[in-house]
């Protein structure tokens, strides 16, 4: 499970929504009373606009973040076009959400902010101070959170809820993990170009996609820049990243990709197109490295041996008191105290009689806040107080192991992997269709803006 850490989450929200939360500015509002232009339009998106100021602000934020991370900053014209394209997609989605009547009330936003704070082991007031210290006004951050929730709810309604995974797909997935590639333990770093051509498309459309794919394959094999080819032509969700998957375990890749990569050396492009049920793929192996996988033939789940001390809030115990008490206990344990004895004495959970020991926990068996904190700990490490719906926890990880789990758990893991892959592709297709049916006019003077 992804860990919600302060820096990445705050930066993500600030980048994603600080420019979406501004309501579309009507053209007649862009001039001052004296006729002097105070802002100009970068793009018209249906019945709204993206202003040059919004675009420049987002570019400034992204540039600052890249500089802080010592990451290369793309040429300004290239960055501007990429940022504007993303803003157009986001604006179209927000307009669609409004049409669908999707709204996020204040209570939901507040609960989300509280969960973000709790995930970082902070009170909401301290969390707010940290955000504002990064130069992001709290009103902007709150608006950004509302935007992210809106887009998430829209995707759930329009895409994720419609993705289905059949039992046959699950069986085939598990069988593929038991096939000739099941023993591979090398993580694979790939690049790919995807051209959509589902099996139920017309023969004309399939042939056109195949011709284009063959032409791109010839360019890639001839030494053309693969990243540029992917950015310009791929219809996959990662096209903007040059089709770069990063290092991925073979179990999380389509079996066709793994089979192709097994015969390639780093830097080589698969000599043939890969035909999938969704279209045509061109695959290039960037590199491989020793992975974390095993040669076992079944999907794995990571179980965690964990114990905790729970203090419930209420009945004379306030939140500050609970946090302070657990911090005191943590300090005493660090000084040589026995965790199990403290759990037996203080914990208000049923596990107190076992010294707080919960045994081996599988993913999804605890509340999200507990699981996120648990997953962030190293073996033997003790957390700071963690807030959940039950109160405050002091958590210690005792060990981890891989387990095949039950047949039902294996099937659930397979269903999740397939569903996630299908949802990402369905979302990319839906976004593309949404973009194709929208009226978008990019102002011609944009390219001359510095």
Curated annotation (Swiss-Prot):
What keywords sit in the KW lines? Chaperone, Isomerase, Periplasm, Repeat, Rotamase, Signal
Q: Where is this region: Disordered?
A: 230-249
E.C. designation(s)? 5.2.1.8
Record's subcellular location: Periplasm
Signal peptide as annotated in the record: 1-27
Q: Which reaction does it catalyse?
A: [protein]-peptidylproline (omega=180) = [protein]-peptidylproline (omega=0)
All residue ranges annotated as the PpiC domain in the record: 185-287, 301-399
Q: Which GO terms describe its cellular component?
A: outer membrane-bounded periplasmic space
**Which GO terms of type biological process are on file?**
Gram-negative-bacterium-type cell outer membrane assembly; protein folding; protein stabilization
Q: Provide a Gene Ontology MF annotation, just one.
A: peptide binding
Checking InterPro entries in the record gives: OMP_Chaperone_SurA, PPIase_dom_sf, PPIase_PpiC, PPIase_SurA, SurA_N, Trigger_fact/SurA_dom_sf
SUPFAM superfamilies according to UniProt: FKBP-like, Triger factor/SurA peptide-binding domain-like
Among Gene3D superfamilies, the record links this protein to: 3.10.50.40, Porin chaperone SurA, peptide-binding domain
| Top-level EC class | isomerase
Q: What does this protein do?
A: Chaperone involved in the correct folding and assembly of outer membrane proteins. Recognizes specific patterns of aromatic residues and the orientation of their side chains, which are found more frequently in integral outer membrane proteins. May act in both early periplasmic and late outer membrane-associated steps of protein maturation.
Q: Which PANTHER family does the UniProt entry name for this protein?
A: CHAPERONE SURA
Domain characteristics, as noted in the entry = The PPIase activity resides only in the second parvulin domain. The N-terminal region and the C-terminal tail are necessary and sufficient for the chaperone activity of SurA. The PPIase activity is dispensable for SurA to function as a chaperone. The N-terminal region and the C-terminal tail are also required for porin recognition.
Q: What is this protein called?
A: Chaperone SurA
Which organism encodes this protein? Paraburkholderia xenovorans (strain LB400)
GN (gene name): surA
């Amino acid at each position: 499970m992804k860990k919600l850490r302060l820096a990445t989450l705050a930066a993500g929200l600030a980048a994603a929504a600080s420019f979406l939360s501004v309501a579309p500015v009507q053209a007649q509002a862009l001039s001052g009373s004296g006729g002097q232009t105070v802002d100009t339009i970068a793009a018209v998106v249906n019945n709204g606009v993206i202003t040059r100021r919004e675009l420049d602000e987002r570019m400034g934020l992204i540039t600052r973040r890249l500089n802080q991370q010592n990451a290369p900053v793309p040429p300004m014209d290239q960055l501007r076009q990429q940022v504007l394209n993303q803003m157009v997609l986001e604006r179209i989605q927000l307009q669609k959400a409004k049409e669908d009547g999707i709204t996020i009330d204040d209570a939901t936003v507040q609960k989300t902010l509280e969960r973000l704070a709790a995930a970082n082991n902070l009170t909401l007031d301290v969390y707010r101070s940290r955000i504002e210290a990064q130069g992001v006004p709290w009103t902007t951050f709150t608006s950004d959170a509302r935007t992210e929730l809106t887009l998430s709810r829209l995707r759930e309604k329009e895409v994720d809820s419609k993705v289905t995974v059949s039992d046959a797909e699950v069986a085939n997935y598990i069988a593929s993990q038991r096939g000739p590639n099941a023993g591979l333990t090398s993580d694979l770093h790939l690049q790919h170009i995807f051209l959509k051509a589902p099996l139920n498309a017309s023969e004309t459309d399939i042939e056109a996609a195949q011709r284009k794919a063959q032409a791109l394959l010839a360019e890639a094999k001839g030494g053309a820049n693969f990243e540029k080819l992917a950015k310009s032509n791929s219809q996959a969700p990662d096209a903007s990243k040059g089709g770069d998957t990063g290092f991925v375990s073979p179990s999380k890749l389509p079996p066709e990709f793994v089979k192709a990569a097994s015969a390639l050396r780093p830097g080589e492009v698969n000599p043939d197109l890969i035909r999938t049920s969704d279209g045509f793929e061109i695959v290039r192996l960037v590199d491989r490295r020793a992975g974390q996988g095993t040669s076992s033939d079944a999907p794995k789940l990571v179980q965690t041996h964990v114990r905790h001390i729970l203090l419930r809030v209420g009945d004379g115990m306030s939140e500050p008191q609970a946090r302070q008490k657990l911090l005191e206990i943590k300090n005493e344990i660090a000084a040589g105290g026995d965790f199990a004895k403290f759990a037996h004495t203080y914990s208000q959970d049923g596990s107190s009689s076992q010294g707080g020991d919960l045994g081996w926990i599988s993913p999804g068996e605890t509340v999200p806040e507990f699981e996120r904190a648990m997953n962030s700990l190293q073996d033997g490490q003790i957390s700071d107080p963690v807030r959940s719906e039950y109160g405050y926890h002091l958590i210690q990880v005792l060990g981890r192991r891989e387990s095949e789990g039950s047949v039902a758990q294996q099937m659930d893991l397979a269903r999740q992997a397939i569903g996630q892959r299908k949802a990402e592709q369905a979302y990319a297709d839906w976004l593309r269709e949404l973009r194709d049916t929208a009226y978008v006019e990019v102002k011609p003077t944009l390219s001359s803006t510095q």
